[in-house]
Amino acid sequence: MTRKQKRLAVIGSGMGFLALAAALTFYALGQQTSYFYMPSDLLSQPAAAQERIRLGGLVQQGSVERGQGTHVSFVVADGQNGVPVVYDGILPDLFREEQGVVIEGRMGPDGVFVADTVLAKHDETYMPREVADRLKKDGLWQEQ
């Protein structure tokens, strides 16, 4: 091989490696995507079965029911609709009724959202902007 052919082979191999790395990165990021919904959005456009999503809204007054151990169920509402949620784990200290939450998990076949992560709103700084903006738009935002 001539010097020029070797250089072209190295450049071609390097570009192929970079293309493979980029493809694997985009594939991995696509697997981690979780779409954001408000309860009304989720009820009008149901998520695909077992699709990981984030649900945001307010914990509905009187809906929190504690079960055995760390099992808890509650309803996340946006003023128009509510979605029942079940969670098995330790809730954040700031979790309470009529407080903003963002939960991550999957919608069950029975219409109950099965959460694996619960994030409680402290203030707008700790809440995703889309949740805070939507709550303000719907007139449900509560200042601390």
UniProtKB/Swiss-Prot annotation:
Topological domains, Periplasmic: 29-144
Binding site for heme: H122, Y126
Residues passing through the membrane, by range: 8-28
Pfam family, one: CcmE
InterPro entries in alphabetical order: CcmE (IPR004329), CcmE-like_sf (IPR036127), NA-bd_OB-fold (IPR012340)
Subcellular location field: Cell inner membrane
Biological process (GO), any one: cytochrome complex assembly
Key words, A-Z: Cell inner membrane, Cell membrane, Cytochrome c-type biogenesis, Heme, Iron, Membrane, Metal-binding, Signal-anchor, Transmembrane, Transmembrane helix
Residues of the signal peptide: none
GO molecular function: heme binding; metal ion binding
Membrane topology type: Single-pass type II membrane protein
Gene3D superfamilies from the UniProt entry: Nucleic acid-binding proteins
Superkingdom, taxonomy of origin: Bacteria
SUPFAM superfamilies in alphabetical order: Heme chaperone CcmE
One GO term describing the cellular component: plasma membrane
Residues in compartment: Cytoplasmic: 1-7
PANTHER family xref list: CYTOCHROME C-TYPE BIOGENESIS PROTEIN CCME HOMOLOG, MITOCHONDRIAL
Role: Heme chaperone required for the biogenesis of c-type cytochromes. Transiently binds heme delivered by CcmC and transfers the heme to apo-cytochromes in a process facilitated by CcmF and CcmH.
Database matches in HAMAP family: CcmE
Family the UniProt entry places it in: Belongs to the CcmE/CycJ family.
Entry protein name: Cytochrome c-type biogenesis protein CcmE
Organism for this UniProt entry: Chelativorans sp. (strain BNC1)
Lineage: Bacteria, Pseudomonadati, Pseudomonadota, Alphaproteobacteria, Hyphomicrobiales
